[in-house]
Amino acid sequence: GPSHSVTHPNLPETPLVPKLSDAPVAVQEDVCRAAAKDLSSYLNDGSIIGTAWGRTMKSFANYVSDLGVHNVKVVQINGKTNETSVPVGADDLSQAIARAGHGEAYVIPAPVAVDSAEIAEMLKKERNISAALTLARECQIALFGVGNLSRNTILYRSGSLKEEDFIELEEKGAVGDVCTCFFDARGEAVSSSFAKRRISITLEELKKIPCKIGVASGLEKKEALHAALLGEYINILYADEELGKELIAI
């Protein structure tokens, strides 16, 4: 049928990816494929692009092909998960884009969340970590998925987000995250113990990145995506048509 599009106050008119399957993985793959196909149009020689890991981005890595640009710098905008238990392909995505953009990948050499706010503050001052975070703030493009607050996420299952963090975030009204930064239904950052222990850029810093590409699929992302758009954390959206139509309905 005709390709539907969505108009939202915080987005240009956005074509939606046709939903051709009832299998969530297939829908996710189609959305990732559409976003990956357009990636080169957002990049120039020497562009700095930030990526955040997660299930959607792990899938995205499979569809990246030569970008026709050179010297692209790819930087991880959130620290590593405890990858021993749950592979998330954080490095796969950075490496795939770096190869396709004939450039280099930089990771934040630290876990996404550490044991205390004090350790987080110290680590953010450590030379290599500080350099990676500085580069992340200099991105012209950020590429990320949208997470909902759920125990079935890599963040929770890997132990980076503890049960007490989950309960605190829930009590404070968190509905989802981008780049492991949680926000409430109005799209406002939720301050929490987890936020203080996190090694990543902040939502305020993300907001300053000119080109923010959000990739999302599945109706369970509805509330989180709606809030992320209210918060203006996404200005280029790739979503399936079922999810996109829900945004108009809210």
Where do the PLM segments sit?
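Conserved phosphate- and dinucleotide-binding cores of soluble alpha/beta proteins
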Residues: 1, 80-250
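N-terminal active-site beta-alpha-beta segment that forms phosphate/nucleotide-binding
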Residues: 5-117, 222, 230-250
